[in-house]
């Protein structure tokens, strides 16, 4: 685990999703708690609980695995997560320049002056901020 807790969170979720794991355990910080709450609200995660070991808190998230049925059979959908603004290169945007991820099917998570929120909420409130990640 490095200093970039957002990248650690996204990588843990991505790896657990690729390996078909049911749960993910990440270190609990204010920013990771807010991002996980957004993922829970948007339906990418089924449940979240806070777990304490010694003096450290962890978030244990249960992933949602969706299965789709086609003519060729059943296949499992994957959750794609991409870190945009990172410690070496910060990406900021105003509310007019907030990108629509996958034509509005995905979400962008922004850190604004009013807290961490999705791209839709930021457009409604007409505020910009730092683009943290894309999820689709």
Curated annotation (Swiss-Prot):
It is found in: Plastid, Chloroplast. SUPFAM superfamilies: Ribosomal protein S8 (SSF56047). GO terms for biological process: translation. Pfam families: Ribosomal_S8 (PF00410). PANTHER family: 40S RIBOSOMAL PROTEIN S15A (PTHR11758). Part of the 30S ribosomal subunit. One of the primary rRNA binding proteins, it binds directly to 16S rRNA central domain where it helps coordinate assembly of the platform of the 30S subunit. Belongs to the universal ribosomal protein uS8 family. This is Small ribosomal subunit protein uS8c. It comes from Triticum aestivum (Wheat).
